[in-house]
Amino acid sequence: MCEEKVTVYCGDEESTTAAALGYAIQSAGHGDSVIIIQFLKGKREEAMELLRRLEPEVRFFSFARSQKNFAELSQEEQQEEEMNIRNGFNFARKVLVTGECSLLILDGFLGLLDNQMISAEDLESLMNAKSEDTKVMFTGKGIDNSMRKYVADIFKIHKE
């Protein structure tokens, strides 16, 4: 695990996602292969269709089954969606283990830590799967203290 290649964008969620997408496009323009995995934001078909046009350089995945954001779901729906989130987390780990991309963006991931859907041990397992050549970017509202030891750069984005 090489912390100087781990970045966090935190703050206003729409802004952090936009910044991460901009970075993904810039990286792809420099020849990097990019995978974006989105968490907690629901299944957004229109956005996914647009992002599919960036393939094969930028690939986008969402394991959500509901159209709604996670916070808008009933408790029963949230339990169901948590299984899908776990699938997304396991896929992220697989991407890191196999070195499938040079940049992995985990959009909304910080919310998984905030909501205790992912433990500090899960995070450690994920970060230990990362090779030195792979850059990882996390986005979300705020950074959990358990993540700080893995991160070189933290960018806080807020509207004025």
Residue ranges and their predicted role:
Residues R53-E55, S131, R148-K149:
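Short, well-ordered coil/turn elements that cap or connect secondary structure elements
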Residues E72-A129:
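Phosphate-binding/switch loop-helix module in NTP-utilizing enzymes
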Residues S33, E100-L103, S131-T139:
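Loop/turn-to-beta-strand initiation segments
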Residues C2-K94:
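Conserved P-loop
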Residues F61-F63, T139, I157:
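Conserved beta-strand termini and adjacent loop/short-helix elements that scaffold enzyme active sites
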Residues R148-E160:
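A short helix-turn-beta junction within AAA+ P-loop NTPase domains corresponding to the substrate/partner-engaging
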Residues G140-D144:
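Short, polar loop motifs at secondary-structure junctions
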